[in-house]
Amino acid sequence: ECLPEETNRRIVDVISDVNLCYSEHARRYLNASGVAKERTYVTGSPMAEVLHENLSEIESSDIHQRLHLQKGKYIDTEKNFLSLFSAVNAMAEKYDMPILYSCHPRSRKRLESSGFALDRRVIQHEPLGFHDYNCLQMNAYAVVSDSGTLPEESSFFTSVGHPFPAVCIRTSTERPEALDKGIFVLAGIDGKSLLQAVDTAVEMNRNEDDGLPVPNYTDENVSAKVVKLIQSYTGVVNKMVWRK
């Protein structure tokens, strides 16, 4: 409920004729909120299809050469919490490796206006394209992000043999099924918790204890299911909603 996009989600849930969910967790949430069971279906996440379709371009990206980064010797971070910049500096100090910060323009302005000095090992970079960003993720020492898609990306790359330590800077998640499988760590939003989470994720990755891919995140026929559900339900919606 504390996520800013939750208001939009709830509006869409109510006005949609059919709700297509990523998991049984999501379906139960919708049903508990009052959405009719006959209007909810589990299709899985489309992320695996998207990543698989683009995998060759992701793997052939030259982003490491362009940024002068050595694979497995940097930490990829994407965050918007000013209070955590000190933790980013602490990561640079502790691991003594480049911290690549994919920085949104608004975050850059906030950082500049605050006068906070980032460690010299922290590399600020404009938001990256899809191929470059995922190439960096799959080869990073660790990935620290507040993105809601991190669990899906971590699950997919684990399923294709490229697991990476995934740490999410949030106090809650709409992806509980990913926590069920241990595919990422929820770090909270304070510096101490973040460092502990990174340590945990990195150590478990070293021990090849990366968690298990979430089945709903590795399903590669999601688009086919969506098309068939829409086709199947169009007549029902026309009759029951639009009275055609």
Question: What does each of the following model-derived ranges do?
Answer:
Residues 21, 41-42, 123-127, 184-190:
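Short acidic-hydrophobic, aromatic-tinged amphipathic segments that line or gate anion-handling sites
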Residues 1-17, 137:
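A conserved, positively charged/aromatic
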Residues 12-79:
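A nucleotide-sugar donor-handling region in carbohydrate enzymes
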Residues 203-244:
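C-terminal amphipathic helix plus adjacent low-complexity
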